[in-house]
Structures are given as C-alpha cells and as structure tokens.
Amino acid sequence: MKKYLILALFLFSCERPEFLFTDGKGAKFADYEDQIIFLNIWADWCPPCIIEFPYFNEINEEPNVTVIGFHFDQFDILPNEEVNRLMNKFNVDFKNLSTDPRNLWSLDLPDSVPTTYIIKNGEILDTITYPLTPEKLRELVASN
C-alpha cells in the first residue's frame, strides 16, 4: 500500500506540459514568460513561408525571443512525422507545435500563409499576414 501511495504522490507532483511540439517534447507557458513569441503559421507549398525560414532561424537565437511554427495543414491533421520531415527538408531550427494553437490562444484559422502572431505573456500583440524580412523581425523585437 505504501508503494502505491508514494507512486501516486510522484505522479501527481509531475508537471504536465500545457502544449506539445512535433518532436514529442512538451512545454508550459511559464517557460516563455517575458519572451516574445513569434508563432509562425507556414506551409511547404507557400514560397514566401520557405523564404522566411532562415530569418526566423536567425531571430530565434536572440535572447528573450522564441519562434514556434505550426504547419497550416496541421489544422487538417497533418501527421507530426511529416511536419518533422518537412522541417528537416527546409532546415528549420525552431520548434513546431503539435497542439492546435487555437486551443492555446484566442486565434482564428488564418486566411492566408504566412501568418505570424506576436505573443508575449499569453497576449497576442500583433498579427502579421505578409512575409517578414530580417529588418522587420528586428524592428518587431525592438518594439516589443
């Protein structure tokens, strides 16, 4: 009985992730407190999305900045394995959500890609529906 009680206490004390990435790892919102999150909705059939990848890879290296992707076709249940394959194909260095972002933030399905949401402390600060340049990304980081 004592073993079961200890096991139960251990299981209840383990922190569960609030969302998952396509690599199987999880995270909590607290992990990104005071960081600027660029949530980039992309697709492999979108040339401007592919052009943005190196820019997002670069800005993701900045302190207090996190880039998180979500493939547009995941709204229709594109498997994580396929998303990971595409991310490798395009040399994407940032993480990609497995959890539908509409369940994490008050987002609507974007009308177009690329769409990038700028989020800080759970609040959506801006929605950008055009391709971003390195200069614009740096400007957005500086202003947020």
Name the predicted role of every residue range.
Residues 84-119:
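Short, internal strand/loop/helix patches
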Residues 1-7:
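Sec-dependent signal peptide recognition
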Residues 12-13:
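C-terminal motif of bacterial Sec signal peptides marking the signal peptidase cleavage site
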Residues 35-37, 41-45, 112:
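Short pre-active-site segment immediately N-terminal to redox-active cysteine/selenocysteine motifs
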Residues 41-58:
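Conserved redox-active cysteine motifs that mediate thiol-disulfide chemistry
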Residues 18-37:
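A short beta-strand-turn-helix
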Residues 65-80, 92-101:
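Thiol-based oxidoreductase modules, predominantly thioredoxin-like and allied folds used
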Residues 118-144:
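Thiol-/selenol-based redox modules, centered on thioredoxin-like
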